[in-house]
Swiss-Prot record:
NCBIfam families: adnlytase_SelO, PRK00029.1. The active site is at D248. GO terms for molecular function: AMPylase activity; ATP binding; magnesium ion binding. This is Protein nucleotidyltransferase YdiU. It is an enzyme of class 2 (transferase). It comes from the Bacteria. Mg(2+) binds at N249, D258. Belongs to the SELO family. It catalyses: L-seryl-[protein] + ATP = 3-O-(5'-adenylyl)-L-seryl-[protein] + diphosphate; L-threonyl-[protein] + ATP = 3-O-(5'-adenylyl)-L-threonyl-[protein] + diphosphate; L-tyrosyl-[protein] + ATP = O-(5'-adenylyl)-L-tyrosyl-[protein] + diphosphate; L-histidyl-[protein] + UTP = N(tele)-(5'-uridylyl)-L-histidyl-[protein] + diphosphate. The gene is ydiU. Nucleotidyltransferase involved in the post-translational modification of proteins. It can catalyze the addition of adenosine monophosphate (AMP) or uridine monophosphate (UMP) to a protein, resulting in modifications known as AMPylation and UMPylation. InterPro entries: adnlytase_SelO, SelO. Its EC number is 2.7.7.-, 2.7.7.108.
Length: 480
């Protein structure tokens, strides 16, 4: 099968990029490929053959139709305007066109210096590359909108961070890499016509149904608000903390993008900060919904030359409803509730209060709850609590609520076990795979990827146990 690549970004947005080629690594070699995604995209097995070396995965070759470029954008970082940013180490190799009309960017991360590298070296290390590959595929398996990881190479190139680490590259695939920061860039350069040009591009390629609408820009922005709200609501329900929700890390399609110092909750700790560089806790777990709105407000400001302030504010006012609707539905699913009743929020808040007091594991709590039976006062979750009387009191109210549903246990458990994962990507699991990979053993990386692809199946191995003490003390930063 021949892969088809287009150059829409290059052809339609000439002021939004710089052309350049990737800079290969020393002795680069393929260490992982995403076989299911490769099959979905029609990527021939021959491209992964060892005799072809690192090839396109290591920036050593281009496929027909590829025309590499680095995109320029700006953004707000930790609440402050950061000015011009851009693809500092990533290169958009091409836009794959599928037969069904869908299009996917192939973006090579760690591909070397670009005009937007600023003080960086344009490289990515094996540690951060593995973390992104694991997180993007874990989130996909959980049903959360995300960029994808297609392939990964390591090398003998030394990269200097807190320590010397091997250089690596990741082929990231997404329907689009357009960020809020793309719009901010030209707004703050006082070039509103280019902001509108980008909006036209995004609508033309990703919202074609809106092209002929008189108020297409407003309808598009309203959908961006909704998508952003729904994605962040999904993060909150699985206990995912992004860590660096700068506006340049916000996808216009509502994808989860730029996996850096992320983390999944172990103990239920609403003020959890996964990024040890986030001294003020701006991007703590509980702050993510508010930050999402703040970022949308920055995007709205960039669109103000061609959408009225009144219309933008009305669209922003829809954010909270969209987020709470999505969050409420998913949390009812997690509790096994098929209908909505007035006291449901109190029921959930009661469980959360217990979990905070007892430092309960977020993922294990909901998974064990999904095995409860409404006719039994016993629950496999009970043994997780020290204060059994407090749990029994809450569980009695929960069972009473389940009886109102008039849904049998099998149907309810099926729904609950389809939204309450048994397995999430805990930092200690990623760290174990990283350490073994750095020692040359990719076995754990493959095993962990395979496990994360099936998160809703009960397991008996250590992938689903609470983290060891050392795993809870892991610190993750923006260093990558």
């Amino acid at each position: 099968m021949t892969l088809s690549f287009t150059t829409h970004w290059r052809d339609e947005l000439p002021d939004f990029y710089t052309s350049l080629l990737p800079t290969p690594l020393d002795n680069a070699r393929l260490i992982w490929r995403n076989a299911p995604l490769a099959q979905q995209l029609g990527v021939p097995d021959a491209l992964f053959a060892p005799e072809n070396g690192a090839g396109v995965w290591g920036g050593e070759a281009l496929l027909p139709g590829m025309s590499p470029l680095a995109q320029v954008y700006s953004g707000h970082q930790f609440g402050a305007w950061a000015g011009q940013l851009g693809d500092g180490r990533g290169i958009l190799l091409g836009e794959q066109q599928l037969a069904d009309g869908r299009r996917y960017d192939w973006h090579l991360k760690g591909a070397g210096l670009t005009p937007y590298s600023r003080m960086g070296d344009g490289r990515a290390v094996l540690r951060s590359t593995i973390r992104e590959s694991l997180a993007s595929e874990a989130m996909h398996a959980l049903g959360i909108p995300t960029t994808r990881a297609l392939a990964m190479v390591t090398s003998d190139t030394p990269i200097y961070r807190e320590r010397v680490e091997p250089g690596a590259m990741l082929m990231r695939v997404a329907e689009s890499h357009v960020r809020f920061g793309h719009f901010e860039h030209f707004y703050y350069r006082r070039e509103p016509q280019k902001v509108q040009q980008l909006a036209d591009y995004v609508i033309r390629h990703h919202w074609p149904q809106l092209q002929d609408e008189a108020d297409k820009y407003l309808l598009w922005f309203r959908d961006v608000v909704t998508r952003t709200a729904q994605t962040i609501a999904s993060w909150q329900t699985v206990g995912f903390a992004h860590g660096v929700m700068n506006t340049d890390n916000m996808s216009i399609l509502g994808l989860t993008i730029d996996y850096g110092p992320y983390g999944f909750l172990d103990d239920f700790q609403p003020d959890f900060i996964c990024n040890h560089s986030d001294y003020q806790g701006r991007y703590s777990f509980e702050n993510q919904p508010a930050v999402g709105l703040w970022n949308l407000q920055r995007l709205a400001q960039s669109l103000s030359p061609f959408i009225s302030a009144e219309a933008l504010n009305a669209a922003l006012d829809e954010y909270q409803h969209a987020l709470l609707t999505a969050y409420g539905q998913r949390m009812r699913d997690k509790l096994g509730l098929f209908s909505q009743q007035k006291g449901d929020n109190d029921l959930l808040d009661g469980l959360f209060a217990l979990m905070i007091r007892e430092k309960s594991d977020y993922t294990r709590t909901f998974r064990l709850l999904s095995h409860s039976e409404q006719l039994s006062a016993a629950s496999p979750l009970r043994d997780e609590f020290i204060d059994r009387a407090a749990f029994d009191s809450w569980f009695a109210g929960y069972r009473a609520r389940l009886r109102d549903e008039q849904v049998d246990d099998a149907q309810r458990q099926q729904r609950m076990q389809g939204v309450n994962p048994a397995l999430v990507l805990r930092n200690w699991l990623a760290q174990r795979a990283i350490e073994q990979a750095e020692a040359g053993d990719m076995g754990e990386l493959e095993r962990l990827h395979a496990a994360l692809a099936d998160p809703f199946t009960d397991r008996e191995d250590d992938y689903v146990r609470r983290p060891p003490d050392w795993g809870k003390r892991l610190e993750v930063s923006c260093s990558s």
